[in-house]
Amino acid sequence: MKIIFMGSPEFSVPALCALLEEKDHEVIAVYTRLPKPAGRRGKVLTKTPIHIIAEQNNIEVNTPKSLKHDYEQEKIFALNPDVIVVVAYGLIIPEAVLSIPKYGCINIHPSLLPRWRGAAPIHYAILSGDEQTGVTIMQMNELWDEGDILLQRDIPIDEQDNIDTLSQKLSNLGSSMLIEVLNNIDHLVPIKQNANDATYTNKIIDFHIDCNEEAQVICRKIRALYPKAFLFFNDKRLRILKANYCPDSDLQNLKPGTVINSHMHIKCKNGVLIPLIVQLEGKNPCSINDFIHGYSISNSSIT
């Protein structure tokens, strides 16, 4: 089967690697996002992980800004793919492109659709305290994450999973499911999603920890937004990379954000946040014990 692969971030890598190991399938071209400026003054252009792997395997790489233009669609048509595989590509796939391959476009989506449609399904599964999540391989249509389900599998969410560890588990699961779908694509019966069960995600832009939230919710936020969740310690950003929590039945009168002891336990709504690994802006990550030995905790401001 001739395949065009569309993907960009690290999450896409296991799927592409799985395809490259298959003798019955050939990746004839890769589509990925444009290299981004990086380094001091943005003088270095950084290619996506998919771009790098494609070049290492002598696969044609395309980095269009959009697939809406006729000449981009004509290029895909000329490649004559049997199927297009889309994994966290980052561009909208127009209906004109969806209809080019014999088997259409199939997508690896890291949730149990129709739960958590949208851009941040793994984050939302952790934030919401879901006990399980999974991967859906779907037949793409012109609607956002509403295509028919070709295959779906679930996995448990471990209490210590953060966005990195859970993403890796789902990425690996999705890559094996992809091969199963491609090898059996003529025999699969697509299943329509139940729109009544749909839930949606939005791009996450707020990484600040609000101590007025419940401590358990804050711990989930730290895991879901790793390594970006932060609070302000004496007006400097302090990232909380790992934390635990406990009930606070004896501390109801304290204001949220209060540092309640020398271990830097922080009063929150209905609980106490127990930081374990932190990173002050401009510094390296460290254990909370190392942090409190280097900074004065008493009379500190936590917001």
UniProtKB/Swiss-Prot annotation:
Its EC number is 2.1.2.9. GO terms for cellular component: cytosol. It catalyses: L-methionyl-tRNA(fMet) + (6R)-10-formyltetrahydrofolate = N-formyl-L-methionyl-tRNA(fMet) + (6S)-5,6,7,8-tetrahydrofolate + H(+). Keywords: Protein biosynthesis, Transferase. InterPro entries: Fmt, Formyl_trans_C, Formyl_trans_C_sf, Formyl_transf_N, Formyl_transf_N_sf, Formyl_transferase-like_C_sf, Met-tRNA-FMT_C, Met-tRNA-FMT_N. CDD domains: FMT_core_Met-tRNA-FMT_N (cd08646), Met_tRNA_FMT_C (cd08704). GO terms for molecular function: methionyl-tRNA formyltransferase activity. It comes from the Bacteria. (6S)-5,6,7,8-tetrahydrofolate binds at S111, L112, L113, P114. HAMAP family: Formyl_trans. Attaches a formyl group to the free amino group of methionyl-tRNA(fMet). The formyl group appears to play a dual role in the initiator identity of N-formylmethionyl-tRNA by promoting its recognition by IF2 and preventing the misappropriation of this tRNA by the elongation apparatus. Belongs to the Fmt family. NCBIfam families: fmt. This is Methionyl-tRNA formyltransferase.
